């Protein structure tokens, strides 16, 4: 790959992230810790700060990672990514941003509309993205951007991240998050269809939880 093509992929990776990456793009380091603390935007409501820290405190491999939460206009409720220059840094020096949507005209699910039991699943999902990024070297991060170009690639990634969330013990929160988005939120039909086609559905989540021994019993209509 020539330099111009590599630079293009890096730019794209910063904006868009994609599907599961082959093991060849993972570093030999099984677990890497960052050096700097988490930073939460003071504008984020206290109850949301509490929900985030509850999840974060139960993920010791991410403790000390340089993670910042901030508000911004997005096309989704929340998104996690490395900062641009983190592509060129060692894992222990990377910085990550979790952006929550503060656009009052957003047609999807606004963060402050999310009920308490679903916030845990939302934050856990985003922190699993960071755990995933921490397992990738430069080539893996670049390939994330390339693979994000396809709907199938994005679906594979988000299913992977949802599965990681369940395995980490946050399946119940993820279930409540997914159920709220699809059945109880004020999001548009188009946005709900996007969510249904890209992420695990509530039934999918319950099935995965049952497989991993974290079942929550819920009767669907």
Regions found by a protein language model. Give the residues of each.
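A metal-dependent hydrolase signature that marks the N-terminal structural subdomain at the beginning
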Residues: 14-87, 218-221
